[in-house]
Amino acid sequence: MKKKLFFIILLFLLVNTSSPTFSITFTSIDNLSKEKNNKTIDDNIQQKKKENPSNQIIEEINTVAKEKESVNNPLNKLVLVNKEQGLPSEFIPEDLVVPNIPFAFAGDHPKKKIRIVAAKALEKLFAKAKEDNIELVGVSGYRSFNRQKEIFDYNARLKGVEAANQYSAKPGHSEHQTGLAMDVSSSAVNYDLVEEFGETEEGRWLSKMAPEYGFIIRYPKGKENITGYQYEPWHLRYVGVEHAKKIAYNDSTLEDYLYS
């Protein structure tokens, strides 16, 4: 009987005792369990990062992908216009302005205009040219669908369609319609748009400095099979500083940059 009573009392004490020692011990065990679980989760996350690109890389890829998706958006600075991809005949940028730069001709003319984002960058480029004693003038900026049709038809009648295709864009396929392009020249070549401009001091300076202000030489030498057009050292296209520098650094073209 005493033995039975002893066990009953012992059991009562074990169940009801609120000893701090027991409480701390159980809490510690619980914390250790949580730490172990957290460590396991962290280990799993680290393993996932090893197996897959980091979130930062994924975000960068997504950012570039979104920009590249915009090649079909006429208002995007990376819009791609070439022989395969064109613009709607009715597309006219709404933010065309005349940049504050010298031109090869006087008077008010639509071809003096470009989009405001490109105009601001062009003004800075020309200001730097003046600072470096480099003479540059604007020759031809924005060109409407209808105006491009007139130019192409004239060249086709003069030299034939095949020849015209090498240096003149068909209507809807001219970068000038984007409002992001400007042809430039200098007195060294009598303000003409000729390949010799690329060999002048002004042409070499332009090729080097244009990317610093967001422009690329859109049709570089040796890339005719990619761009579809002959070398045009005078043809500037605005794409933004970051993109322009990358394209220039890789000696690339807009086509390669967008689809590589």
Mark where each language-model region is.
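Sec-dependent N-terminal signal peptides of Gram-positive bacterial secreted proteins and lipoproteins
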Residues: 1-26
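Extracytoplasmic cell-surface/polysaccharide-interacting catalytic and binding patches
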Residues: 19-141, 145-260
